């Protein structure tokens, strides 16, 4: 279950606000740089989340979570290498080199107790989330600057 509050104290704006937007740790650096009026460096990932909070709009439909375990857990033969996609409605998780995964309908199962990954009724949802996860992985990959000249 991933539901972690993030508290931001802003000396430029002391009025309390809250948001249910999907935020990530990759959003912290762009937010700090924006607040300090510093141009972000080439290839920075994430977005300035204060704009979303001030406008009361969500800036992303889903969010990828990466996890690389450093120990072998029960049921695994090596440390887990995991990618999850969280949306308002679903959480979808894949484990590297494993046949199983996780799919939870957060609207009907907010405590994530009924894994729907192998449920045939959710196969189209699983396919859609798989594609979105791949797109998130491509979006968050490090990018090199484009060359200014070609030889």
Predicted regions and their residues:
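Membrane-interface catalytic loops of GT-C/OST-like multi-pass glycosylation enzymes that act
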Residues: 1
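Long, internal low-complexity/basic segments
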Residues: 73, 116-151
């Amino acid at each position: 279950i991933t539901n972690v509050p993030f508290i931001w104290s802003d000396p430029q704006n002391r009025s309390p606000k809250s948001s249910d937007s999907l935020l990530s740790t990759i959003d912290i650096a762009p937010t700090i740089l924006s607040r300090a009026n510093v141009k972000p460096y080439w290839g920075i990932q994430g977005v300035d989340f204060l704009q979303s909070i001030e406008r009361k709009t969500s800036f992303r439909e889903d969010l990828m979570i990466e996890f690389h375990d450093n120990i072998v857990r029960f049921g695994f033969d090596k440390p887990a290498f995991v990618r999850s996609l969280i949306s308002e409605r679903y959480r979808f998780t894949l484990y590297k080199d494993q046949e199983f995964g996780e799919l939870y309908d957060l609207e009907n199962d907010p405590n994530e107790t009924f894994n729907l990954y192998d449920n045939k009724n959710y196969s189209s949802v699983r396919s859609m989330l798989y594609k979105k996860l791949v797109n998130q992985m491509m979006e968050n990959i490090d990018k090199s600057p484009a060359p200014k000249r070609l030889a």
